[in-house]
A protein has these predicted regions:
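Conserved cytochrome P450 K-helix E-x-x-R motif and the immediately C-terminal K′/meander segment
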Residues: 17, 21-29, 218, 304-346
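Hydrophobic, repeat-rich solenoid/adaptor surfaces of innate immune receptors and signaling proteins
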Residues: 51, 126, 273-278, 360
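N-terminal membrane-proximal hinge/A-helix region immediately C-terminal to the signal-anchor transmembrane segment
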Residues: 1-98, 120-125, 129, 150, ...
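Cytochrome P450 heme-iron axial ligand motif
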Residues: 262-269, 279, 387-409
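Structural signal for hydrophobic/aromatic residues that build the beta-strand cores
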Residues: 32, 42, 123, 155, ...
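Cytochrome P450 catalytic-core helices
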Residues: 269-294, 408-409
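Cytochrome P450 heme-thiolate monooxygenase catalytic core
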Residues: 66-81, 114-274, 290
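Conserved cytochrome P450 K-helix/beta-meander segment immediately N-terminal to the heme-binding cysteine loop
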Residues: 239, 358-386
């Protein structure tokens, strides 16, 4: 039996709770893995893994006395504040399956093709605005900002039926700007709860967080009310859930909470990936030139570029995968709790109640998984399966199992 106390990495017990608050945990954990190996203890009852097989063992289904089951998310991280409504993020297994079924159609190939014209409209708008602001390439631009403005506009249209107009104003919508602050505040509250000070979390929420969250919810509720008043069948990301509102007795708060989650999940992470990819391409001109050649030889003009045609660009997909590996939008892990009776991870028995996770930053930069892990090398994903020494199955940017990212496609 592998117990957390049996493992090295004890220094992390003292420093990880503090480092969580300043949001550098993933980088510390990666250094611990480099020093101690594929399993390290990052706090008294918390283990981090980097073995590829651990993805399915932690986030997939586990055999148990009650049949096949998934590990529960740790309530420390999934239920930070008691007063907040449930969403697909922290729903129990049955409710999660129900919500996911309702949302699945909006993420299907057919639905994406139907929404393709709208998405391209925003991409064209981004291109036009960059030409306007960049002064023929002589004026530096904050691409992270431009990508976020684009993805939030797209997400707003796909979910609420209205754009946030970020591209139009070349700035964040007040709601979007406030959300970023709320996310940072939420990370701090989670860290405080992690070190056992839940009463402080509740007090902070009641003192200031509740007011802040009420402002977010007020704006979200207003957009949701506008979306519900739309009479046309939009077939967008949220249509499936709205159609089942009465059948499943979904409250307005539940609808609003899930809409907020979808906007965040579909915008900021995409923008982060685009920012990382852009940086890596511009700092590796040989990769950029090869990608440019593939794209320009595949299409006569931009009108031929669509969801179906870009999926055939093997080198472009390799560049995206390598960018997701080196610059993951989610650096830390989703923390699960070993079930009653314990479980097996990496060939070891893990006692029940132990917190376990795979942090993408550590897994993606492990020399056990990736030779020369800090090198930007899209060719990793083009080598034949027989000769490839990279553990491609260790890259799981969208996670695995029943709670993996529904927007993976």
């Amino acid at each position: 039996m592998l117990k957390a106390a049996d493992l090295t990495g004890a220094l992390a017990e003292h420093y990880v709770p503090i480092l969580k608050i300043i949001l550098v945990t993933a980088f510390l954990t990666q250094k611990l893995h480099d020093r101690y190996g594929p399993v390290v203890r990052i706090s008294p009852n918390h283990l981090s893994f980097t073995q590829p097989d651990a993805w399915k063992e932690i986030y997939g289904f586990q055999p148990s006395s009650k049949g096949s089951t998934e590990m529960n998310k740790s309530k420390i991280f999934s239920e930070t504040v008691e007063e907040l409504p449930k969403s697909i993020i922290n729903a129990d297994r049955e409710e999660h399956q129900r919500l996911r079924r309702a949302l699945a159609h909006g993420f299907s190939d057919a639905s994406m093709r139907e929404q393709e014209g709208m998405i391209i409209k925003y991409i064209d708008k981004l291109s036009d605005r960059l030409k306007e602001f960049a002064d023929d390439g002589t004026s530096p631009q904050n691409m992270a900002g431009w990508y976020n403005w684009t993805t939030f506009d797209v997400a707003g249209d796909l979910i609420f039926g209205q754009s946030f107009q970020c591209l139009e104003r070349a700035d964040y919508h007040p709601w979007v700007a406030f959300i970023f602050g709320a996310i940072r505040f939420g990370s701090v509250m989670t860290s405080v709860k992690y070190i056992g000070l839940n009463f402080v979390v509740q007090a902070l929420f009641k003192m200031g967080g509740m007011k802040a969250m009420s402002q977010v919810r007020e704006n979200t509720d207003e957009m949701m009310q506008n979306r519900m008043r739309m009479t046309d069948d939009r077939n967008d990301l949220f249509e499936g859930l709205l159609k089942r509102r009465k059948e499943w007795n979904l409250s307005f708060d539940q609808l609003s909470a899930n809409a907020l989650i979808l906007v965040l999940a579909g915008s900021e992470t995409t923008a982060t990936t685009l920012s990382g990819t852009t940086y890596l391409l511009l700092t590796h001109p040989e990769v950029y030139e090869k990608l440019k050649k593939e794209v320009r030889s595949a299409f006569k003009d931009s009108s031929e570029i669509n969801i179906g045609s870009v999926s055939k660009l093997s080198y472009m997909l390799a560049v995206l995968n390598e960018s997701l590996r080196l610059y993951p939008p989610v650096t830390s892990g989703i923390i699960r709790e070993a079930p009653e009776g314990g479980c097996r991870i990496g060939g070891q028995h893990i006692p029940e109640g132990t917190l376990v996770e795979i942090q993408q930053w550590s897994s993606n930069h492990s020399p056990d998984n990736w030779p020369d892990p800090w090198k930007f090398d899209p060719e990793r994903f083009l080598e034949s399966e027989k000769t490839n020494v990279n553990r491609l199955d260790s890259l799981q940017a969208f996670s695995v199992g029943p709670r993996n990212c529904i927007g993976r496609k």
